[in-house]
C-alpha cells in the first residue's frame, strides 16, 4: 500500500446511490481515552502507540513526524487527514485501510477520530462501518464517557454521540439558477451546517458543498443520520429540478458554457486552481446531463484530485513557482482527458 501514489480512494472510484449529485458520504466519531489529557492540552506519542496496538495488520500506521510536509498535504487532498492534523498535530498519526475508505486520526483534536467514507448517499453504510470499528476499539480501550453528556470531546459541540455525519454534494444547478442561497438558509434553519470541500474553515467553491449535522447531544446516531438523509433527499430533488430547467429553457446557453469549459480543459497550457475547478464543475454537469458519454464520473474525480497543488508537486518532483504549477496542472488535466 502506497497512499501517496496518484490513485483514487475506493469511495471516489466506485459508484454510489444518487452519485449524479452526491459525491460522497462520511461518518466521523470523536473519542478520547479515559484518564488521559485531551490532545489539545497535551499530545503524547505513547497514546498513538497504545491505540495503534489495538489494531491488526489490516491498517497501516503513518506518523506525522515521520513524513514530509508534501506527504501530509497529499493526505489532506485525499481527505484522509484534516488540515488541523497537517499543521498543528506534532505527535499525530493516522491509521488507514487498504481501500482508504477508513481513516482513523490519532492525536488530532481528540485521541481518536474514526472516519468512514462511502460513495454517493450511503450514510447508513458509513455509520455501520464506523460503529463496528468503534465497538472493536472500546473492547480494548476505555473511553472518556459521562452518563449525562455522553462521549467527552475536546470541543463541546461534539459531546454526546461525538458524531459528525456529512455529505459532499455538487450543486451547479442550484448555483446557476441562483437558488443556492435560499436552499442553504433552509438547510441551516433545520440545524445543519454548510461548508466547503475540506470541511470546517473551508469555503464552498465550484458548486461543491459539504452538509453536516450540528447537533450531537440529545439524539442517537441513527436519528442524526435519518435526519440528514431526509434533508439530502430534498436537496437532490431540488438540484435535479434545477438541472432539468437549465437543460429545457436555456439549452444553447448551457451547452455553450459546458463545451467552452471542456475546450479550456483539453487545450489549456496554463491554468489556475480556481479556473480549473470551475471548468471541471461545468464539465461534470455536462457529464451528468449526457453531453459527454465518453467521460466517466471516475474520470471527473481524477480531475478534481490530481489537479490539486500537492499532487502537482509530486508529479513535478519538486517545489514550483506559481506559473510552473499552472503549467503542470494544464498538462495533467490534458493527459487525464486524453488530449496531451
UniProtKB/Swiss-Prot annotation:
Top-level taxon: Bacteria
Keywords noted in UniProt: ATP-binding, Kinase, Nucleotide-binding, Transferase
PROSITE patterns per UniProt: PHOSPHAGEN_KINASE_C (PS51510)
Catalytic activity: L-arginyl-[protein] + ATP = N(omega)-phospho-L-arginyl-[protein] + ADP + H(+)
Annotated ATP binding sites: 24-28, 79, 113, 164-168, 195-200
Any one of the GO BP annotations: phosphocreatine biosynthetic process
Annotated Phosphagen kinase C-terminal domain residues: 21-242
GO function terms (MF aspect): ATP binding; creatine kinase activity; protein kinase activity
Keyword ATP-binding: yes
GO terms under cellular component: extracellular space
Documented EC number(s): 2.7.14.1
Gene3D superfamilies: Glutamine synthetase/guanido kinase, catalytic domain
Enzyme class: transferase
Entries under Pfam families matching the protein: ATP-gua_Ptrans
Functional note: Catalyzes the specific phosphorylation of arginine residues in proteins.
Family: Belongs to the ATP:guanido phosphotransferase family.
Alphabetical list of NCBIfam families matching this protein: PRK01059.1-2, PRK01059.1-4
Protein name: Protein-arginine kinase
Originating organism: Listeria monocytogenes serotype 4a (strain HCC23)
Organism phylogeny: Bacteria, Bacillati, Bacillota, Bacilli, Bacillales
Gene that this polypeptide is encoded by: mcsB
